[in-house]
């Protein structure tokens, strides 16, 4: 009998807990759904460093590119700042990518959407060691700029033509029309 009453008490406690927690749940309304209450939060774009210890990200409303430590999240170094970069007339930028050797940045600004995820923008190359920002090319906005595997050239599209910019010489040549 003792075992039966103990089981009965445990069952009643368990049942009452279920009812308590069930009735405390707030109903989801249409307003909750349409207001974006359950919308996921984006994190800033993060580019991992080759050393595996650091990452690069844009801060201050896309006016700086900093190197941070994964372990602490603290800034270790500033790679680019629109206020201190030489020959920089940008107030802010829209995005960036890092060369494979991590000596140059490809920074773009004044983006114009084309279709879904594609866009045209004014691209710039930034030499980190010299703190110098230069336009990638003259002649209009570029698309799909990407570094070569060795980081010495940048391929891009302008007016449906494919170009290559040789960073060592500062020249760009038409590759395919």
Label the predicted regions.
Residues 74-102, 112, 140-141:
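Blade-loop segments of beta-propeller domains
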Residues 58-82:
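Beta-propeller domains
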Residues 54-55, 105, 151-154:
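Hydrophobic beta-strand positions that form the internal "hydrophobic ladder"
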Residues 50-51, 100-101, 149-150:
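Residue-level detector of Asp-centered blade-edge/turn motifs that repeat once per structural unit
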Residues 34-64:
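Beta-strand-rich domains and repeat architectures in extracellular enzymes and scaffolds
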């Amino acid at each position: 009998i003792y075992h039966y009453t103990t089981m009965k008490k445990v069952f009643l406690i368990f049942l009452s807990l279920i009812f308590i927690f069930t009735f405390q749940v707030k109903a989801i309304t249409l307003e909750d759904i349409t207001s974006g209450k359950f919308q996921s939060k984006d994190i800033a774009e993060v580019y991992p460093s080759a050393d595996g210890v650091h990452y690069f990200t844009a801060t201050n409303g896309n006016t700086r590119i900093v190197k941070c430590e994964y372990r602490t999240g603290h800034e270790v170094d500033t790679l680019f700042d629109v206020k201190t970069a030489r020959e920089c007339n940008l107030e802010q930028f829209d995005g960036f990518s890092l060369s494979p050797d991590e000596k140059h940045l490809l920074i773009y600004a004044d983006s114009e959407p084309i279709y879904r995820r594609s866009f045209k923008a004014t691209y710039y190359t930034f030499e980190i060691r010299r703190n110098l920002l230069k336009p990638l090319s003259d002649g209009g906005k570029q698309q799909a700029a990407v570094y070569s595997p060795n980081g010495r050239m940048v391929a891009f599209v302008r007016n449906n033509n494919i170009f290559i910019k040789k960073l060592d010489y500062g020249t760009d040549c038409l590759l395919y029309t």
